[in-house]
Amino acid sequence: MTELPQAFLSQMAAQLKGEMAAFLRTYDDPYQRGLRVNPWKRPTRLPDDCGERVPWDENGHYLALTSTAGADVLHEAGAWYLQEPSAMLPAAVLNAQPGEHVLDLCAAPGGKSTQSGLRMGGQGVLVCNEPVWERAKILSQNIERMGIPNALVVSAYPDQLAQRWPEAFDCLLYTSDAADDKA
């Protein structure tokens, strides 16, 4: 099993209580790759190694571990976005709707933002924030590549956004990797 930091294990044990053993067993499961089809681009084909649909996203598919779908010209054209199936879950649960004002607080590289933008149907406002400027540039490229017309990419810290846009959003998406989780 993957060696995990003790602070993380303690935090998860407090949250999961009796489900901790089942949670730890998931680390023995094989790694999963996936892609999300961009229905706005209507690709004429999918990669040969594109598998079954991901149950929680109508555009998500499992992908072979050896796939080269990222080198395909259709990937560069925004016909699909490479994204782990588990990473598709937060935006699916958020289920942003057309006309809403949505803030993705830590948006890079853009998977959850593009997923939310597609769900919004190009209507409303999607603010995609990434405090680290270099990552914000990648985010901007992915938003453009996927053709999300109602997205605005910004690079600010959460307190700056709260001061500038208090109570401006209907919903907020926040996901953080362990390196960012210092709270």
Where would I find each of the regions flagged by the language model?
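Glycine-rich nucleotide cofactor-binding entry segment
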Residues: M1-A168, L172
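Single conserved hydrophobic/aromatic residue that forms the stacking wall/gate
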Residues: Y174, A178-A183
